[in-house]
Structure formats: C-alpha cells, structure tokens
Amino acid sequence: MKVVLLKDVSKIGKKGEIKNVSDGYARNYLIPKGLALEATPRVLKRLEAEKRKKEEEKIQIKTQNEELLKMLKKFLYKIPVKAGESGKLFGALTNSDIAKAVEKIADVNIDKKFIVLEKPIKEIGMYDVLVRLPEGVSGKIKVEVIQEGKN
C-alpha cells in the first residue's frame, strides 16, 4: 500500500514522502497512530497544494529578509562603550549589544542569534558585522565602536 508520511518514521522515511509499505503495517500501525495517510489522489493533491503554499511562504520570507537587510545596511551603528586610553574595552561587545544598537538606531527588533561575530569585539574602531537572516539572506552592516563621552 502506498502511504504519505505525516511525520518522520524511523526506517521508513521522512515527513511528506510517499512510501510503499505492507497493508497490515499501514492499517494497523501507521494510519491509526497518525503517522501516515493512504496515498489517494485526493490526499496527493492536498499534499501538493501544501508544498506549493510552503514554497510561496519561503519566497515571501526571503524577500522580506532581503528588504530588511537592505534597510539595515543604510545605517552606521555607533556604539559608545567604556574603554581605556589604549582603546581596549572594559569587557567586550557581543552580538547582544549590537542587536540592541540596531533596535535603537534602525528601530528594528532583530534577534541576537542573527548577528554573527567571529569573536567578541574588544577594541575601539570600525567593524563589518555579519547579519545572517533566515532563508539564506546575509550581509554585513557597519558598526563603529566609540569611547563613551567622545564623538
């Protein structure tokens, strides 16, 4: 019997796949437990419509993220921090601090997990910081770390 898997099933397949299994296994285990549906033309048509809808949503999210990144790139994010005379920071600037600066300057709430730092920033200066948004959208924003009280 052909079935459409509704969830990942070990040793059978992943969600959305169409698999051939024995009639007894399908009727007595997969279908009653809600792990699969019989692959009728109606079910296949519905599955295809759901796939199309998910693809359209992915494209829409990617477009929105590209627009967001384009907008974020327009700003220079100046972050005042406490630092010594040599330019070394007291502490370090993390992705969380940069996310707060983006929210304050660009008025966009961005999760800190989307800001990628190879290592925490520990000195005053200009930095290109990678922003990696969902759906493979990524780019760099300019961050200037300045000493508190100086412009």
UniProtKB/Swiss-Prot annotation:
GO biological process: translation
UniProt signal peptide: none
Name of this protein: Large ribosomal subunit protein bL9
GO cellular component: ribonucleoprotein complex; ribosome
SUPFAM superfamilies, per database record: L9 N-domain-like, Ribosomal protein L9 C-domain
The UniProt record lists the keyword Phosphoprotein: no
Entry similarity comment: Belongs to the bacterial ribosomal protein bL9 family.
Organism of derivation: Thermosipho melanesiensis (strain DSM 12029 / CIP 104789 / BI429)
GO molecular function: rRNA binding; structural constituent of ribosome
Gene3D superfamilies for the chain: Ribosomal protein L9, C-terminal domain (3.10.430.100), Ribosomal protein L9, N-terminal domain (3.40.5.10)
Gene expressing this chain: rplI
Function: Binds to the 23S rRNA.
One Pfam family it belongs to: Ribosomal_L9_C
Domain of life assignment: Bacteria
Lineage, top ranks: Bacteria, Thermotogati, Thermotogota, Thermotogae, Thermotogales
InterPro entries in alphabetical order: Ribosomal_bL9 (IPR000244), Ribosomal_bL9/RNase_H1_N (IPR009027), Ribosomal_bL9_bac/chp (IPR020594), Ribosomal_bL9_C (IPR020069), Ribosomal_bL9_C_sf (IPR036791), Ribosomal_bL9_N (IPR020070), Ribosomal_bL9_N_sf (IPR036935)
Keyword terms of this UniProt record: Ribonucleoprotein, Ribosomal protein, RNA-binding, rRNA-binding
